[in-house]
């Protein structure tokens, strides 16, 4: 029986191989670019800097929420572990189908663990933006 971390590792390896076969090799530069976007948004959220946090979102997300204020209301109400994490750590990016996905483990303000799956979108200028985030409880409890 495979644990969650082992399964994630297998998915990551298979995903990377599939991406390379499609000519979309996932390189260290892309990995660093995605992490920089996510860390930038987490830091902006920690300062309640809605304008900066909103700037890391993809154009489609920006169209959906229209203003930094509306975006921040959504984050505060639905993404508390991301908005006020006790801690977070990056896992290996996943490339299976669709856009690259960056898993990030969070311990939320209530001490509960979640994995946030960040769907990343490459922009015309080569930069990355966050195209969506889903939260998945892990059952972990932080100190």
Task: Please identify what each model-predicted range represents.
Residues 18, 71, 110-114:
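Aromatic-enriched hydrophobic runs in primary sequence
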Residues 9-47:
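Short, low-complexity N-terminal intrinsically disordered segments enriched in polar/charged residues
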Residues 9-11, 92-143:
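Exposed beta-sheet edge and beta->alpha loop/turn motif
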Residues 25-26, 32-36, 40, 50-97:
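Short solvent-exposed beta->alpha transition segments
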Residues 1-8:
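Bacterial N-terminal signal peptides that target proteins for export
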């Amino acid at each position: 029986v495979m644990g969650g971390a082992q399964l994630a590792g297998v998915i990551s390896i298979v995903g990377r191989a599939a991406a390379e076969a499609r000519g979309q090799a996932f390189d260290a530069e892309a990995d660093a670019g995605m992490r920089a976007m996510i860390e930038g948004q987490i830091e902006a959220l920690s300062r309640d800097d809605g304008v900066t946090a909103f700037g890391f979102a993809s154009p489609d997300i920006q169209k959906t929420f229209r203003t930094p204020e509306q975006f921040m209301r959504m984050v505060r109400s639905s993404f508390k572990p991301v908005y006020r994490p006790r801690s977070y750590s990056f896992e290996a990016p996943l490339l299976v189908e669709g856009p690259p996905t960056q898993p990030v483990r969070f311990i939320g303000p209530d001490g509960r663990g979640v994995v946030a799956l960040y769907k990343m979108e490459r922009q015309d200028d080569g930069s990355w933006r966050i195209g969506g985030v889903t939260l998945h409880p892990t059952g972990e409890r932080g100190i």
